[in-house]
């Protein structure tokens, strides 16, 4: 959706550009990828390499008590006793159950499963579950994805003669069940982020090893029997929204490989029902296509349909179950929509103090308890505040809570637990149950707690950006798309990279899809274009066509019919600064100090006049670069200058941009340093016509993010000031070797970025024509002077010399023209009149070639053009 407010709903963390350069060089990464890694905390080459390789792995034996647990389980498995896997009704619980059932059966155990009914049984191991296990004659129950909080239930099971092993990953309470526990935190496992299926996989691996059925050598390398279950581990890891970092990255990557190469019968059928191509399946398909269908059965019907699907080898049976899950998912969407609509009505009926509070607690009768959790997530997306939805059934209300970053749901429920019958969950998601007569008191207490923990800023959805890019070199294109893809799998803890295209434009917008809600377009940034799409935004996209915008996008590899191409997916549109843009009006972009005060202007005029008279026109071109260290040079030519500048500004390091004429480049600077983007100040601009106050202000290194823009004249006038900036970005090529050297001089280390291309070269050549090929300027000045015998001085003379253009001539150009006029005996310079005066001696036509200075200026012109062209070839 579009954002047009004054506060920008995104942020990009500052970083050390040196770290980015090291990663890019040593790991051969495009700079936006290196920036993304550094911003995400992978700041060293070793840390980034480990992340990219995703090889982290730990042995199951690193769970304390694993050997004891395996001995206990195998003792039952080798006998006649029944083992029951007690799971849960979501994807993580279903897949964990399937992993252990299949493993134990392969080891010869009599093994079945028990998945509680969400509606009638509730979550986890309950007293009703214990009674059911007794009736089955279960000798050993292994909980998966539950049990860590079931202290009383475990005790009851053991009292009934049932052995218990708890495997779980949920947050443990103060008291643990009195039985063997396999849990990433409780058992001291090196990686605490495993989901329940990950824990079950580790247990299954340990069981096979203990039973002598571990790793074997195959033609394709070492294989473990439980490698076949990595597809289920990947599915659960993504679906349960555990962080996709550390060992989870390896598990999901390897699981996706299993899904692509040899999917099990049940998942092959489910992928067909969900229209997912196994060859291109990714974490997004797991999260948004497969997981909802498995969860739908647990929300509405029988969760063990998912277990049966994972275990069956019968294609016909798998297809039937997959079709059942697909139908359930359609019904789930309908039920979810009804709950969301009912919740919005309930919110509207609340008094403003509750409807607009930092959290929402909403209740209603007839809300399907199986979908209140996902409906709560929808309300969080809309209103961006912690939300609890409760389904009322008689005197009891059951529901789910979903949170926003920075608000701990478990802590909030702990603080209000006196009103609850039971609750549990994570920081971001929880379930709860209470008596209806405590609902109002609970709502008041929960809202009070939320108000004490959250402020207004917390309830603004903050989009965290990874990098700022344009179209072209190191920007949007196939190479970057492929490199960004290598950062996957994406999900919780490792979201897909979000890029910002600063000051981009949407061109050639066309509707997409049968209902026209979507759109395709060409995204323009700098001189480059890339194809893109936006989903559900066609109206907004169409209204904003051709407008300069900041666009939050994802860049993906679009695969279709064996072909690949980069595709931009727009997620958010942000309006640029809507204050009046005064760039392009010559005298205004630099502020009050432009043009220079009289004394300064005439001093520069006199200096150049003397240089021309000595046969050395353009003395500023020859300012000597100071001795000392030189900056590292970064070649950004062929990229988008606005994006390059904006990215460097976002780093928080000082940035100086140098161009041919800062007044003409003011619009570019404003686009790169929009003050609402990162809280940066407006760009500080000083052009070749400015006075020293403006120039000194522009070249003062800022304390925070910001941009200074000067032209090569400013660099020549203040050569030492350039050295204090961390980054110097060369927007237009330097007109001389001396000025080129100044751009690389440094006292703080740093970088010189070459950001010019053919267009900038052409502009520089045109401006050099204006500055050195004086015929047109002389003719214009001549027409503005009095008739022969007259004089011009002071303000009128300066006006004649500057001209009426939005971009007045500099004192140096004016001085060259006056020197030529004097050498041709058309004028006489009268230096004794204070600011100077010019007497007109003749109005006769003459040949400019008679002037020695005119020839010297032409020679200087050709010298600078040759230098520019040589640099263009370098």
Question: What is the predicted role of each segment?
Answer:
Residues 99, 175-218, 226-238, 437, ...:
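Short alpha-helices
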Residues 88-89, 116-119, 146-147, 162, ...:
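Short, ordered loop/turn segments at secondary-structure junctions
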Residues 2, 13-139, 160, 209-437, ...:
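Hydrophobic helix-and-loop "lid/oligomerization" segment in the mid-to-C-terminal part
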Residues 131-220, 245:
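Active-site cavity-forming subdomains of large catalytic enzyme subunits
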Residues 40, 144, 363-366, 634, ...:
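Structural motif
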Residues 675, 681-726:
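Conserved motor-coupling elements within RecA-like helicase/translocase cores
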Residues 228, 702, 719-720, 724-725, ...:
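C-terminal helicase lobe
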Residues 249-292, 296-346, 381, 401-645, ...:
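Acidic, two-metal ion nucleic-acid-processing modules in DNA metabolism proteins
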């Amino acid at each position: 959706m579009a954002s047009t407010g004054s506060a920008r709903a995104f942020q990009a963390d500052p970083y050390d550009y040196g770290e980015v350069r090291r990663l890019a060089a040593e790991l051969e990464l495009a700079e936006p990828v290196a920036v993304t890694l550094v911003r995400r905390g992978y700041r060293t080459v070793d840390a980034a390499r480990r992340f990219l390789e995703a090889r982290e792995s730990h042995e199951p034996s690193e769970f304390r008590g694993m050997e004891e647990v395996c001995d206990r389980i195998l003792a039952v498995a080798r006998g006649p006793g029944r083992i029951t896997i007690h799971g849960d009704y979501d994807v993580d619980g279903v897949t964990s159950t399937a992993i252990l059932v299949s493993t134990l059966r392969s080891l010869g155990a009599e093994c079945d499963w028990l998945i509680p009914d969400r509606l009638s049984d509730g979550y986890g191991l309950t007293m009703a579950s214990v009674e059911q296990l007794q009736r089955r004659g279960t000798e050993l129950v292994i909980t998966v994805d539950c049990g860590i909080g079931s202290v009383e239930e475990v005790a009851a099971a053991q009292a009934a003669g049932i052995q218990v092993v708890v495997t779980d990953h949920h947050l443990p309470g103060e008291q643990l069940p009195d039985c063997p526990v396999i849990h990433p935190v409780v058992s001291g496992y090196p990686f605490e982020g495993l989901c329940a299926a990950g824990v079950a996989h580790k247990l299954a691996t340990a069981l096979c090893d203990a039973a002598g059925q571990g790793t074997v050598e195959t033609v394709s390398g070492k294989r473990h029997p439980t490698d076949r279950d990595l597809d289920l581990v990947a599915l659960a890891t993504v679906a349960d929204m555990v962080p996709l970092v550390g060992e989870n990255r390896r598990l999901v990557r390897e699981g996706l490989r299993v899904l692509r190469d040899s999917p099990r019968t049940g998942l092959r059928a489910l992928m067909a029902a969900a229209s997912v191509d196994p060859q291109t399946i990714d974490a997004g398909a797991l999260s948004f296509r497969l997981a909802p269908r498995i969860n739908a059965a647990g929300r509405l019907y029988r969760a063990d349909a998912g277990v049966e699907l994972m275990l069956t080898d019968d294609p016909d049976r798998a297809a039937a179950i997959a079709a059942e899950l697909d139908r359930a998912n359609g019904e789930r969407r309908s039920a979810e929509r009804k709950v969301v609509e009912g919740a919005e009505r309930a919110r509207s009926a609340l008094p403003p103090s509750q409807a607009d509070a930092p959290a929402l607690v909403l209740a209603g009768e007839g809300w399907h308890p199986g979908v209140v959790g996902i409906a709560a997530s929808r309300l969080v997306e809309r209103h961006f505040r912690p939300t609890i939805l409760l389904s009322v059934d008689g005197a009891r209300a059951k529901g789910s809570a979903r949170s926003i970053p920075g608000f701990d749901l478990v802590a909030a429920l702990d603080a209000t637990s006196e009103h609850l019958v039971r609750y549990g969950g994570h920081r971001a998601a929880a379930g709860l149950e209470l008596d209806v007569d405590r609902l109002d008191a609970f709502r008041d207490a929960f809202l009070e707690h939320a108000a004490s923990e959250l402020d207004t800023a917390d309830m603004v959805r903050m989009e965290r950006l990874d990098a700022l890019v344009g179209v072209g070199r190191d920007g949007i294109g196939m190479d970057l798309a492929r490199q960004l893809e290598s950062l996957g799998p994406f999900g919780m803890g490792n979201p897909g990279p979000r890029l910002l295209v600063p000051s981009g434009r949407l061109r050639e917008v066309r509707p997409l899809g049968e209902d026209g809600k979507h759109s395709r377009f060409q995204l323009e940034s700098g001189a480059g274009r890339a194809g893109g799409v936006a989903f559900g935004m066609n109206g907004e996209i169409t209204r904003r066509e051709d407008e300069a915008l900041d666009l939050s996008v994802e860049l993906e590899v679009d695969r279709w019919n064996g072909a690949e191409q980069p595709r931009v997916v727009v997620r958010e549109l942000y309006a640029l600064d809507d204050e009046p843009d005064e760039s392009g009006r010559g005298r205004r972009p630099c502020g009050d100090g432009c043009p220079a005060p009289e004394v300064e202007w005439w001093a520069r005029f006199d200096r150049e006049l003397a240089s021309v008279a000595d046969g050395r026109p353009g003395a500023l071109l020859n300012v000597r670069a100071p001795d000392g260290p030189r900056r590292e040079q970064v070649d950004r030519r062929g990229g988008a200058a606005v994006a390059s500048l904006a990215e460097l500004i976002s780093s928080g390091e000082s940035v100086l941009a140098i161009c041919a004429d800062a007044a003409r480049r003011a619009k570019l600077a404003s686009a790169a340093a929009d003050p609402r983007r990162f809280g940066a100040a407006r760009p500080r601009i000083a052009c070749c016509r400015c006075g020293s106050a403006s120039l000194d202000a522009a070249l003062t290194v800022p304390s925070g993010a910001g941009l200074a823009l000067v032209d090569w004249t400013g660099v020549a006038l203040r050569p030492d000031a350039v050295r204090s900036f961390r980054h110097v970005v060369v927007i237009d090529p330097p007109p001389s070797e001396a000025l080129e050297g100044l751009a690389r001089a440094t006292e703080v280390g740093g970088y010189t970025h070459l950001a010019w291309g053919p267009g900038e070269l052409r502009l520089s050549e045109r401006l050099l024509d204006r500055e050195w090929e004086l015929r047109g300027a002389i003719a214009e000045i001549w027409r503005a002077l009095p008739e022969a015998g007259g004089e011009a001085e002071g303000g009128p003379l300066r006006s004649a010399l500057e001209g009426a253009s939005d971009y007045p001539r500099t004192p140096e150009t004016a001085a060259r023209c006056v020197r030529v006029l004097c050498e041709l005996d058309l004028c006489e310079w009268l230096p004794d009149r204070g600011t100077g005066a010019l007497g007109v001696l003749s109005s006769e036509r003459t040949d400019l070639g008679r002037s020695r200075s005119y020839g010297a200026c032409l020679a200087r012109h050709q010298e600078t053009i040759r230098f520019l062209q040589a640099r263009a070839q370098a």
